[in-house]
Structures are given as structure tokens and as C-alpha cells.
């Protein structure tokens, strides 16, 4: 019976249910790609890590292009209960649209979301040769794990600082060159505090003048998909020269003295930006995204 099911190709539906790598496998099968279909899980840093793997493979000459996909569909009663037991979710959800309050003094947790994002990452020469519209350039990546706690960041912020610093070094840019930071910005009391520490350490006296915003305030936290989704936000910020706001920022936190682009989108000159993704388990990925060079 098993052989008959395989012969009839009816096994695919079951395969997709129990194989964690099935998303990458199905995409490879659909598009006929020849590179290795890799699925990875580094919690909320997964999407950023996928982009990093693509960048490194292209730099090594192993690939001309890669399809980087971040996707998550974790909203379920069990997941809500588990995150609630961690005190990670916002409980102030009336009205629901005001529940996510990254960087605000009255923040109390994140809002779960489902979503997906996809980026075609390829060498600039390849993109130009086929006449592709180039939204931006992945200029550098940095990653660092702090191995401190399953759900908490190390209070010294060293891994976050190292992640951002490595990304800047990889992109051959100084902190002064960065025009915008797309924050991980979950809205949990501890995460936002640690990200603020990292940004202020890396950017020094200029940190207060670097716009930093969290699109999670508008769309919620897409978990494993967040790195790719937020890289897309960052690319569009560069393409349109417009910064997405951090909405629901009605009670500023004196302990986070940053320009969080409160409540209203803003036109701005953006040549170079950083996108941060920090995951449970201590995985941290930062990506530097730049405008296409002339």
C-alpha cells in the first residue's frame, strides 16, 4: 500500500506535514532550482540567517542567486498558551490594534502574527545582466549567539553589540554611515531595553539621532519569518526614501532615549540601513542593506 501511495504521488501531502524542510524542498521542486534546499531554525533570527547564508554562498562563488524565504504559521491555542506562560505576550489588547507598543514605557509584550516574505538575493552583476529591478544591496551581515538563557538576552548586551558591529565591519562601513535601523523591537520590556543598549553602544553619541523603528508595532511579530519580512521593509524604506513608524508610541520611555519614528511615517534620506533580528535561544543577526551603487 505504501508503494502504491508513492507511485500515485499522493504521499506529498503527508510529507509536507512531518518534514520540517518541506518548504525549501517544495520550492526547489516547484522552481527546479539546483542548489541545496536548506531549511533552518534559529527562532526569530531565522529569516536573517537565511539571508546571511545566501550572501556568503554568492560571495564564495557557489551560487549566482538564492531565494530566501521566511515563513511562520504558529498562531494556535498551544503556542499562545506557551508564550503566555513565558509572559512574552501583550495582555493589554483593547483595542487590539494598540496592543503592540515597542519602545513605549507601557509596553508589556509582543503580538503574535503569521506571515511570510521572500527575497531574491543574487550577485549585482547577475541582476544587472538580466535587467532586474534592484531594490537594494545586502552589504554585510553579522551574527553572534550569547548562549545566556533560552528566552532572555545577556544583560551586558555583548552579543547584540557584536552582531551589529560585525555587520558594519562586513559592509566596510562606519556607524556614522547608517541612516536608519529597522529594529527587532518586539515590545517586550527586556528585548527593547537590550536593543537600545546595543544601538547606543555601537552608535555612541549619535545614537539619539539615528531613526530606529519597529514595524512589529503595525503587523505583529511574525517569528521565524520576521528577518525576511523586515529586510523587505528596510529595502522599501531605501527604495521610497520613507521610514515606517513605530505606532502606539504614546508613552515614551525615558530609559530608551532614541528617535523611534513615533506614530507617523517620515520622509528621509536613506543610503545605508541596519535590520536586526534577535531570537530566543540567543541567536542574533544584523544585516546592513544599502542602496544600489551608481
Annotate each predicted stretch with a short phrase.
Residues 1-4, 13-53, 62, 85-111, ...:
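Conserved catalytic cysteine-centered active-site region
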Residues 171-177, 208, 256-294:
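Flexible, low-complexity linker/loop segments at domain and module junctions
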Residues 4-11, 52, 56, 74-129, ...:
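Glycine-/small-residue-rich "gating" segment that lines the acyl/pantetheine channel
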Residues 50, 163-171, 202, 234:
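Stable alpha-helical structural segments in soluble proteins, enriched in small hydrophobic residues
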Residues 119-123, 169, 191, 200, ...:
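Short beta-strand-to-turn element immediately C-terminal to the catalytic PLP-Schiff-base lysine
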Residues 27, 47, 54, 83, ...:
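Conserved small-residue
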Residues 62-108, 141-155, 183-192, 209-259:
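Acyl-CoA/ACP chain-elongation machinery
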Residues 94-171, 180, 294:
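Condensing-enzyme catalytic core mediating Claisen C-C bond formation in acyl metabolism
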